[in-house]
Every structure is written in C-alpha cells, then in structure tokens.
C-alpha cells in the first residue's frame, strides 16, 4: 500500500466550497489510522465500510478539532523562515461544525477521502480488489540489477513517490509569498525549544514502543519503526503546541 502521507494527493485538488478540505485530507489517510493506534501496520478495520463509520469518521472529527484548535497556529509560527511567513495567513482560518449542513459536508468529504484511499490501495496491495481481479498486476517484471518485482508493488512504490511530489507541489502553491507581515514570528530560541520537544518526545515514544513490543514478544520491523516514529512526532508536536 502507498505511504499514508501520500494519499492526500488524491484529494488536494478538490479544494472548493462543496467539500470540507480538512475532512478530505484526513479522510484520505483515515483507513491507515488503525495502524497508528496499534503502533504497527496491523489491522484492516479502517479499510472496511463498518470501520469507515465506527473508527475512521470519529477519528477524523477528533483530529480535525485537535489540529485546528491546538496544533495549527503554533506549528505554523514555529516553522523555519520563510515558511512561517508563507503559511502565516492559514493561522486565522476558522474551523468548526456549527450547523447540520457543515456536519454533513464534513462527513461526505471524509468518506470521499476514505474511498480514494481504498481505491488506491486496491491497485497496490496483494489482497487489493483490482490486484485480485486484474491478472497483469500480479505478474513480475525485471528491474535494475536483474531483480524481479510484482507489478502491483512497482505501482505501489511509484505512486507513493508521485503522491508525495503532488502533495509537496500543492503545499508550494498554497504559500503566500507576497506576505510581508510576520504572523506571530517566533525567535530562534522559541523554535529551537519547540523542535527539541518534538524530537525528544519522538525518541521517547520510539524507545518505549520498541521495549513494549519486545516485552510482548511481538516482532518489531521497519513498519513498526515508521509508524512509531510518526506517532512520536505527532505526540511531540501536540505537546510542543502547549509550550509558552
């Protein structure tokens, strides 16, 4: 399956008034959220219809609230220059579900994001719908060095790279390079402390997850390392957001 953070590439260009953009982004990653709850790439509930409603959707609402109310403003103001200035205008954008219409828009936007995720995975995982029904995706081809690789695996890795590039391009286009106001500009010391909190927290989470998995005799591979690292960074950013 493609890297979780590449999945928003499928929805970033749907940014308009008909959709809740936060819900689209979170929804596009939501089927993988169960991995982060498990601290390893294990569990399939998030990719099932039932999981869309009992797991993914509640997590999308919770994460949207946490991001907009606690993380967004401190994160942007602690970005290195000129990024803090480029994206400073986003700090004032309001988020809330204050009416039934806004709730409905959030829900169908999140669900659309989840559908794009599952469809994408369907082409890139051995148990994916399209991989199971399209024979040539299960065939092997020879790549550099004479190594053989399944076509669906090649699609997975290639689409991940393309997805990340699209996301980065979108973020670049989202900037406001004409901004001259320093939106809550932070000093080097403030940014250093913020980053230090994130790094230390991420290391602690990573070490603790390794110790716990070893204690429980659960195999600890590269997937665990990646998921635990992302968890640690997120927790670190959340903690750092409350620093004075």
Task: Pin down the residues of each PLM region.
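N-terminal membrane-targeting hydrophobic helices
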Residues: 1-244
């Amino acid at each position: 399956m493609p890297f979780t953070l590449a999945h928003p590439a499928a929805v970033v260009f749907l940014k308009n008034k008909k959709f809740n953009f936060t819900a689209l982004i979170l929804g596009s990653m939501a089927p993988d959220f169960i991995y982060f709850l498990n601290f390893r790439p294990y569990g399939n509930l998030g990719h099932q219809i039932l999981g869309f409603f009992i797991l993914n959707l509640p997590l999308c609402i919770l994460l949207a609230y946490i991001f907009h109310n606690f993380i967004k403003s401190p994160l942007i103001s602690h970005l290195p220059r000129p990024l803090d200035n480029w994206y400073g205008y986003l700090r004032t954008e309001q988020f809330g579900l204050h009416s039934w219409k806004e709730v409905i828009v959030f829900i169908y936007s999140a669900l659309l994001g989840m559908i794009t995720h599952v469809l994408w995975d369907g082409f890139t995982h051995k148990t994916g719908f399209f991989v199971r029904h399209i024979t040539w995706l299960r065939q092997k081809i020879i790549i550099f060095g004479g190594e053989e690789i399944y076509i669906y695996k090649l699609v997975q890795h290639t689409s991940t790279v393309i997805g990340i590039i699209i996301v980065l391009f979108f973020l670049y286009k989202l900037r406001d390079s004409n901004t001259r106001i320093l939106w809550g500009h932070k000093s080097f010391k403030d940014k250093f402390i913020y980053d230090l909190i994130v790094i230390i927290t991420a290391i602690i989470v990573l070490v603790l997850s390794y110790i716990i998995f070893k204690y429980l005799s659960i195999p600890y591979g590269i997937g665990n390392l990646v998921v635990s690292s992302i968890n640690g960074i997120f927790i670190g950013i959340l903690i750092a957001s409350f620093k004075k």
